[in-house]
Curated annotation (Swiss-Prot):
Keywords for this protein: ATP-binding, Kinase, Lipid A biosynthesis, Lipid biosynthesis, Lipid metabolism, Nucleotide-binding, Transferase
Catalytic activity: a lipid A disaccharide + ATP = a lipid IVA + ADP + H(+)
A biological process term (GO) from this entry: lipid A biosynthetic process
Biological role stated in the UniProt entry: Transfers the gamma-phosphate of ATP to the 4'-position of a tetraacyldisaccharide 1-phosphate intermediate (termed DS-1-P) to form tetraacyldisaccharide 1,4'-bis-phosphate (lipid IVA).
GO CC, alphabetical: plasma membrane
Species this chain originates from: Rhodopirellula baltica (strain DSM 10527 / NCIMB 13988 / SH1)
InterPro entries (alphabetical): LpxK, P-loop_NTPase
Associated pathway: Glycolipid biosynthesis; lipid IV(A) biosynthesis; lipid IV(A) from (3R)-3-hydroxytetradecanoyl-[acyl-carrier-protein] and UDP-N-acetyl-alpha-D-glucosamine: step 6/6
Stated name of the protein: Tetraacyldisaccharide 4'-kinase
EC number: 2.7.1.130
Length: 365
């Protein structure tokens, strides 16, 4: 199992070792903070080159490491753009990919959006070039792009997870902020995800913190809603079958607590949860450990009737059972608690301008 660093970073661990570790991490964060601010000044002052892809670029990113729920946001944006009849391509760095294969996020998006190409490249400027020149993309959605400022973007969307919004108040490694919190001033929109998993007062506090740094930035509230239970072979069941059903969970994601809470909210009884490192590739040793774990649970006082994982895990496991216990996943869809109309209008305005610019170029040619 992976080490749970959250009690240390959050301050819940009060033992002497944890206190010393937080002090050491705080010192290291000072160097990281200086480097992050220097990099930001370089871009803000124009000392670093920013490349134009030639088509609109919509960035979906976050302030923190770990799972904030970007994938359903990316899928939602791509569906909206496809409904407007534009050729969309997703570009990303491809973190966790190996041997030329797509990473788990790209595999999940491919299943969600079979008509949307996905270009993964360590250099996202090159990924944008491939998408535009070779795939004739008319708009790019850059996954995890907030800190990747070398590619110019026309819309910067920051995703904040309500269950852990601001990385314990510190940049890496003392917290999980990728850059200082005031960087949210660059955002054009903020989407707060999983607002249903926290109290309304906490959502108001998140909004207040955002407003301190970006008072004019629109903020939308969203929930992650499971639609059905699916298997790798395409079978599906209504989500209601989980009510009072003993289940065991396995996940290799950045925010396993949020996944577990989603399952609990569906009425299931969670017997155990095997938490693996984020982006674990489920190699043979991991699969053997997984089978042993399930076998042990089957002989326990409350054997699980079903195993559940996330969509990201399902595309890597590629099986419908483990040790004789059915395995399924719950596709998560984005549901807007606040009106989504302003975002839709912003996309239409962005793409309408793109069409006009393209027409002008065609006329001048």
């Amino acid at each position: 199992m992976s080490w749970d660093y959250r009690p240390l970073l959050s301050g819940q661990s009060r033992d002497p070792f944890s206190s010393m570790a937080r002090g050491a991490l705080w010192c290291a964060s000072g160097f990281y903070n200086v480097a992050a601010r220097h990099r930001r000044r370089q871009y803000d002052s124009g000392n670093r080159e920013i490349c134009n892809a030639g088509v609109p670029v919509i960035s979906v990113g976050n302030l923190t490491t770990g799972g904030t729920g970007k994938t359903p946001v990316v899928a939602d944006l791509c569906r909206r753009l496809r409904a407007m009849d534009f050729r969309v391509t997703i570009i990303s760095r491809g973190y966790g990919a190996s041997d030329g294969r797509m990473n788990d996020e790209a595999m999940e998006l491919q299943e969600r959006l079979p008509d949307v190409p996905h270009v993964q490249h360590p250099d996202r400027v090159e990924a944008a070039r491939i998408a535009v020149e070779e795939l004739a993309a008319e708009v790019l959605v850059m996954d995890d792009g907030f800190q990747h400022r070398r590619l110019q973007r026309d819309l910067d969307i920051v995703v904040i997870d309500a269950t852990c919004p601001f990385g314990y108040g510190h940049v890496l490694p003392r917290g999980t902020l990728r850059e200082p919190l005031d960087s949210v001033t660059r955002a054009d929109w903020v989407l707060i995800t999983r607002v249903d998993q926290v109290d309304p007062e906490e959502v108001l506090a998140i909004r207040s913190t955002i407003a301190q740094h970006a008072p004019d930035c629109p903020v939308l509230e969203t929930e992650h809603r499971p639609s059905t239970i699916q298997s790798s072979v395409g079978d599906w069941e209504a989500i209601e079958v989980l009510i009072d059903q003993p289940v065991a969970l396995v996940s290799a994601i950045g925010n396993p607590d949020a996944f577990e809470q989603t399952v609990l909210d569906c009425g299931a009884i969670v017997v155990d949860h095997l938490r693996l490192p984020d982006h674990d590739s489920y190699e043979r040793a991991t699969r053997e450990k997984l089978r042993s774990w399930v076998t042990k649970l089957k002989g326990g006082p409350q054997p699980p009737q079903r195993l559940l994982c996330t969509h990201k895990d399902a595309v890597k496991l590629a099986t419908d059972s483990i040790a004789g216990v059915p395995l399924g996943y719950m596709p998560i869809e984005l549901a807007y608690r606040t009106s989504e109309e302003p975002l839709q209008l912003r996309l239409e305005l962005l793409m309408g301008g793109s069409v006009e610019n393209q027409s002008s170029r065609d006329d001048s040619a």
